[in-house]
């Protein structure tokens, strides 16, 4: 699985068979706002979603920028996987109840 950061469309993409999994984002200063998660029905299982989120969050961590998860599924994933908590900007923890 090859993760693509499509900067023109401001989204992460992952090709799955004939479908595309997408996380839309907005980049502001040194923060990336993850605004929408789209998982194709053909692979809509929790394992795939988690793998996709891990790929995206690892890419963001490598770029050393903060992440603001505005999409509920992504915020829930970060709540559940505390190793990504360090990527959140100061002050955001209480907003997403982490």
Regions inferred by a protein language model and the residue ranges of each:
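Conserved acetyl-CoA-binding loop-helix of GNAT-fold acetyltransferases
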Residues: 44-58
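Anion (oxyanion) recognition and catalysis
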Residues: 61
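Conserved beta-hairpin
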Residues: 10-20
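Active-site rim helix/loop that mediates acceptor-substrate recognition in acyltransferases
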Residues: 1-11
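A short, structured beta-strand/loop element
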Residues: 20-42
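Conserved small/polar residues in nucleotide/adenosyl-binding loops
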Residues: 96-98
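C-terminal structural segments of small proteins and small subunits
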Residues: 66-90
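Compositionally biased terminal segments of proteins
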Residues: 46-47, 91-94
């Amino acid at each position: 699985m090859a993760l693509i950061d499509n900067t023109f469309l401001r989204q992460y993409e992952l090709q799955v068979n004939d479908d595309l999994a997408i996380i839309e984002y907005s980049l502001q200063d040194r923060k990336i706002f993850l605004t929408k998660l789209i998982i194709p029905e053909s692979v809509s299982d929790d394992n795939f979603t988690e793998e996709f989120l891990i790929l995206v969050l690892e890419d963001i961590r490598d770029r050393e920028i903060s992440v603001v998860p505005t999409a509920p599924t992504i915020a829930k994933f970060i709540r559940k996987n505390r190793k990504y908590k360090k990527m959140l900007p100061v002050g955001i923890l209480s907003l997403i109840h982490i």
